[in-house]
Amino acid sequence: MDFKQYSPEELKECSMIEVVHSVLGDKKQATTFNELVQEIAQVLGLSQEQVNAKIAQFYTDLNIDGRFINLGENRWGLRSWYPYEQIDEEILPQPKPKKKRKVEEDGFDDYIEEDEDDFDDADVNEDEDDDVEDLDKVLEEEDGDDDDLDDLDEDDDDFAEEELEYDETEEEEEEEL
């Protein structure tokens, strides 16, 4: 479509989408979004402020309109240029086949009785018996510490009794009033 044949009034009535469709049809190759915006601004005589105000709606319209296709890397083309099968090939990256890993043997399956060590009671070291006796002595000493706790419990009981007596005295005084 040759835009020179249109008057400025007729160009202002054209939508940005119509202009892009004509521009891409004339070029017959995919073009980046920024280049498309510059060409629209030039054809329609839009200022940078006007372009900035309309760019979001234009991008939305470009995505929604079924005549256009995004080819990736911000390149746009006409859907009629690409058969359906070719679109899938160009847009989607080819999946790479995954390599199969070899299963490593963990060595647990092979059980050999020769490797098993028999455990005998004779192998127990006598030093371990001494360690147990030392622990018993420490525990007995700690049991003596419980007497101190018992004394503290008795003090708590005495304090609780004093509080009860004090509360009873207060209640009696309140009843008298």
Curated annotation (Swiss-Prot):
Alphabetically ordered keywords of this record: DNA-directed RNA polymerase, Nucleotidyltransferase, Transcription, Transferase
A single MF term (Gene Ontology): DNA-directed RNA polymerase activity
Gene3D superfamilies cross-referenced by the UniProt entry: RNA polymerase, subunit delta, N-terminal domain
Pfam family, one: HARE-HTH
Feature: compositional bias, Acidic residues: 106-177
Keyword DNA-binding on entry: no
Region of interest: Disordered: 90-177
Subunit note: RNAP is composed of a core of 2 alpha, a beta and a beta' subunits. The core is associated with a delta subunit and one of several sigma factors.
Protein purpose: Participates in both the initiation and recycling phases of transcription. In the presence of the delta subunit, RNAP displays an increased specificity of transcription, a decreased affinity for nucleic acids, and an increased efficiency of RNA synthesis because of enhanced recycling.
Protein family membership: Belongs to the RpoE family.
Alphabetized HAMAP family for the sequence: RNApol_bact_RpoE
Protein name: Probable DNA-directed RNA polymerase subunit delta
Species, as recorded: Bacillus cereus (strain ATCC 14579 / DSM 31 / CCUG 7414 / JCM 2152 / NBRC 15305 / NCIMB 9373 / NCTC 2599 / NRRL B-3711)
The gene coding this protein: rpoE
